């Protein structure tokens, strides 16, 4: 899924560039792509910008991130799969020195560069290890500032590998990772404005990647919606996608996955409702945070000189988590 909008100022003024990435999110999850999940901020961006119906990335998160930041095939950047070193040129598990990142290029052009959220482009993802090779960490690959996690998925309440710049940091009481990413990104917007520098901001949410961790106030809004079951929900999504022009009318709804029973035959339906509601709440919370970032751009007078790009890294997750 990709969503882009741009409204740039004078030709001589360098635009801010803000890239926002969701993690393991399905094509039709958000409202402007047919989903029942409430995403008003993304929907407004879609209405005022460019909504893609054909957009390609890789099937795993690390290769997509490598390609996005370097403009290369992931193997050329050294991340042909995940972050395990397979001792093959294209599968070293972290960014190599034969590639240049967007941050490195934009920094040389006077941009202030910041990465917030999930990194997942280094084999050495423990910030407490003083001897760790930091050559593929954000600050060593062109970013002036970093707050987030070096590894992939993990707890939203106490994430592993939480890092500020090159040093470990801790989750305070009441910490929720999606909110922390949003707050930090909004602060970066305000800081860059005070510095009078164009901004390159890479915001990489972990939502809605497993584990299913959400706040009760968000989950409560979705239980009734998902009580109708996945068969009715997927039919409704399909109909909305046709109405939005995302798919052709002659493209019929695909059969339900053989591994998934009909909703009326599903065991533990209350538990299934809860799972779907929590997943939706994770995306809802991310959209709320995107609203905070947009508001910071608006308050600083930078919104009309900012190119915004929203995408997901690899589509919905098909893994079964025990």
Task: Explain the meaning of each model-derived region.
Residues 1-322:
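Formylglycine-dependent sulfatase
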């Amino acid at each position: 899924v990709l969503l882009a909008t741009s409204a740039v100022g004078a030709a001589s003024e360098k635009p801010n560039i803000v890239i926002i990435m969701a993690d393991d999110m399905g094509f039709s999850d958000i409202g402007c792509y047919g989903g029942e999940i409430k995403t008003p901020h993304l929907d407004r961006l879609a209405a005022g910008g460019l909504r893609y119906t054909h957009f390609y990335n890789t099937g795993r998160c690390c290769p997509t991130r490598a390609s996005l930041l370097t403009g290369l095939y992931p193997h050329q950047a050294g991340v042909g799969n995940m972050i395990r070193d397979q001792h093959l040129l294209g599968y070293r598990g972290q960014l190599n020195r034969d590639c240049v990142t967007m941050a490195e290029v934009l920094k040389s052009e006077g941009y202030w560069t910041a990465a917030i959220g999930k990194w997942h482009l280094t084999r050495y993802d423990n910030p407490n290890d003083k001897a760790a090779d930091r050559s593929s960490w954000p600050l060593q690959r062109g970013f002036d500032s970093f707050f987030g996690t070096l590894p992939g998925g993990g707890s939203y309440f106490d994430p592993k590998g939480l890092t500020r710049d090159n040093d470990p940091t801790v989750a305070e009481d009441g910490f929720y990772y999606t909110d922390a990413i949003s707050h930090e990104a909004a602060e970066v917007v305000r800081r860059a404005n005070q510095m009078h520098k164009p901004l390159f901001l890479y915001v990489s949410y972990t939502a809605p990647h497993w584990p299913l961790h959400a706040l009760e106030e968000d989950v409560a809004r979705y239980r009734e919606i998902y009580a109708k079951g996945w068969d009715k929900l997927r039919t409704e999504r399909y109909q909305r996608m046709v109405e939005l022009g995302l798919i052709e009318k002659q493209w019929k709804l695909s059969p339900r996955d053989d591994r998934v029973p009909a909703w009326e035959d599903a065991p533990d339906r209350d538990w299934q409702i809860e799972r779907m509601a929590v997943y939706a709440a994770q995306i809802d919370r991310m959209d709320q945070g995107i609203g905070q970032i947009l508001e910071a751009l608006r308050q600083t007078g930078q919104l009309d000189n900012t190119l915004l790009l929203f995408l997901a890294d690899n589509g919905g997750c098909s893994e079964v988590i025990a």
